[in-house]
């Protein structure tokens, strides 16, 4: 619509069309996104009158990075296909990793069992019945050596989903790389290391916020000096969404956490451009196709603007929001699990069209158990078909310029900014966590969504509509109970054969350092090289830092 006369004519045409449509029958159901954002029946140039191409879109690889963080995106290379995997002991998971790499996977992603996540060794009383169940059991450097046996760590990047004990697990990985003859400057990968979203959503915390943030800034500083290819935090919206948030809440709360980490790094005396380039993100890909695409585009623009204008970042790499995506586990159904293949495909496609840097596609059986080899192969093949057969990777940001996509991207950005203002008024992210703001927002959103499903206002195929009485006939992966016994026995033998004087000295040095402002990463690295266990290190740090206790919120 180029001039006032044309605009008047177009408005007249639009009004006539609206009158015609308003008298037509409508199919039942609400016309909103999954998150409840109302959708117009038609989007036109009038919805983008305030859009400034250069300021709001630009070109791929250029500020504000709405259209992607690389100049040539998938014309250069495909996203990293990184299937999240881990179960049993290190031997079991090593076999799965090597199988996935043989099948064409291009990166690794480690799932740890609950005892490892919570900082307990496999022989701890609280680990009983949980060893190797929901991920791989890692007690010491010895397990890490087995986990990556015959996998050269200078040739593959690894993402590790670990938070409370992230510094310890990371040091085990670095020590293992050095044992392979790989220099720290060559090691690439990611640790999740996002403790704020633990307080908000996943609840797998160990230490209180202040010492937890201290460990994170220690990692930022050590990596900047010694491990330059490592992504030090994967700021995670995935778990926030899985807990029941809307897409807008996932966007806003994740970026708010990111800003809090930037502020913590700066407060620790670090220049923003020394650590911000190695911050990465982890988003959910849910089923509302266009809402998810717009979420990713808005995230890149918001991050770039805030890092530049609010935090004074000058290195273009600091402004680029790079992210991993996982399809939505909460969208999968136990009923008719084969339907989950279709759900995962749609979600994966939205992540690709939204410009993800790496992707995990859930397996159809993950709602029932850890995935079988067959199921995980289908999930990987889903990515490969999208990459090599669909053609969607041949054009960079192909949905740019769509009136609907650009309008929804703008709307999500505006709603996220409104959340930032509310969080700021509460005193920042930590204060908002303490008063239960995030937790209440997520709980309310989850309740409203479930109500809509229960009332059939939201259709879930095979669950509340088009459902069958047939029970699924599907093979499930079962963890051998003997895994726990074997892991405990290996741990006992490790404690007998290691140099326990060296372990004691290393742990004592760590205890002394933890009571000062000294960077703890070198001390932890020394301890794990002596084969101190994760549980031993966590127990020591609990003595110094204490443990977190959440206030009653509901």
Regions of interest found by a model, annotated:
Residues 2, 18-50, 58-66, 114, ...:
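Flexible, glycine-rich loop/tail regions that form catalytic "lids" or insertion modules at the edges
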Residues 129-133, 198-207, 240-245, 283-288, ...:
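Short beta-alpha connecting loops at secondary-structure transitions
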Residues 271-275, 313-327, 335-364, 371-396, ...:
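Flexible glycine/proline-rich, aromatic-decorated loop/lid segments
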Residues 139, 157, 162-165, 177, ...:
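Phosphate/diphosphate-binding loops
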Residues 1-286, 291-292, 310, 317-324, ...:
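Catalytic alpha/beta active-site cores
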Residues 87, 96-103, 141-151, 172-176, ...:
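Generic, well-ordered alpha-helical scaffold segments in large soluble proteins
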Residues 77, 123-126, 153, 196-199, ...:
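Short acidic (Asp/Glu) and glycine-rich catalytic loops that position anionic groups and cofactors
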Residues 94, 170-171, 248, 293-297, ...:
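Conserved strand-to-helix beginnings and helix N-cap segments that scaffold or border functional pockets
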């Amino acid at each position: 619509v180029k001039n006032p006369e044309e605009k008047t004519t177009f408005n007249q045409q639009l009004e006539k069309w609206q009158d015609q449509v308003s008298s037509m029958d409508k199919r039942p159901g609400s016309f909103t996104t999954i998150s409840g954002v109302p959708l117009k029946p038609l989007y036109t140039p009038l919805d983008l009158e305030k859009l400034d191409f250069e300021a709001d879109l630009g070109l791929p690889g250029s500020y504000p990075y709405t259209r992607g963080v690389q100049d040539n995106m998938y014309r250069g290379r495909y996203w990293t296909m990184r299937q999240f995997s881990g179960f049993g002991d290190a031997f079991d998971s090593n076999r799965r990793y090597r199988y996935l790499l043989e099948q064409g996977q291009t990166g690794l992603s480690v799932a740890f069992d609950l005892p490892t996540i919570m900082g307990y060794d496999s022989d701890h009383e609280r680990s009983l019945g949980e060893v190797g169940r929901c991920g791989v059991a890692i007690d010491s450097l010895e397990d890490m050596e087995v986990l990556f046996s015959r996998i050269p760590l200078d040739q593959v990047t690894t993402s590790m989903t670990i938070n409370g004990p992230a510094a310890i697990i990371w040091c085990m990985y670095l020590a293992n790389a050095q044992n392979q003859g790989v220099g720290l400057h060559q090691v690439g990968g990611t640790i999740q290391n996002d403790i704020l979203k633990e307080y908000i959503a996943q609840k797998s915390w160990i230490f209180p916020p202040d010492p937890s943030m201290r460990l994170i800034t220690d990692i930022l500083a050590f990596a900047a000096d010694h491990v330059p290819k490592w992504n030090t935090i994967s700021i995670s919206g995935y778990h926030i969404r899985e807990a029941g948030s809307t897409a807008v809440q996932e966007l806003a709360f994740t970026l708010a956490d990111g800003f809090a980490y930037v502020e913590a790094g700066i407060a620790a005396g670090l220049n923003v451009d020394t650590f911000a380039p190695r911050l990465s993100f982890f988003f959910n890909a849910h089923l509302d196709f266009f809402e998810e695409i717009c979420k990713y585009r808005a995230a890149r623009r918001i991050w770039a603007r805030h890092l530049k204008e609010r935090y004074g970042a000058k290195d273009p790499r600091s402004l680029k929001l790079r992210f991993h995506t996982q399809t939505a586990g909460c969208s999968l159904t136990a009923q008719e699990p084969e339907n989950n293949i279709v759900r995962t495909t749609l979600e994966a496609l939205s992540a690709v069209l939204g410009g993800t840097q790496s992707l995990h596609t859930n397996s159809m059986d993950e709602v029932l158990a850890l995935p079988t080899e067959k199921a995980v192969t289908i999930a990987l093949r889903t990515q490969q078909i999208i990459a090599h057969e669909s053609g969607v990777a041949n054009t960079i940001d192909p949905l740019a310029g769509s009136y609907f996509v650009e309008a929804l991207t703008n709307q999500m950005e505006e709603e996220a900014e409104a959340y930032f203002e509310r969080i700021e008024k509460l005193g920042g992210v930590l204060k908002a966590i303490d008063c239960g703001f995030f937790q209440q927002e997520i709980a309310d959103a989850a309740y409203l969504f479930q109500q809509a499903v229960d009332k059939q206002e939201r259709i879930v195929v095979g669950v509340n509509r088009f459902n069958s009485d047939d029970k699924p006939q599907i093979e499930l992966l079962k963890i051998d109970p003997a895994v726990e016994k074997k892991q405990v026995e290996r741990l006992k033998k490790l404690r007998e054969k290691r140099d326990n004087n060296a372990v004691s000295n290393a742990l004592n040095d760590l205890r002394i350092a933890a009571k000062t402002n000294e960077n703890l990463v070198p001390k932890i690295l020394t301890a794990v090289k002596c084969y101190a266990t994760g549980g031993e290190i966590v127990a020591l740090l609990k003595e110094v830092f204490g443990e977190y206790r959440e206030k009653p919120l509901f």
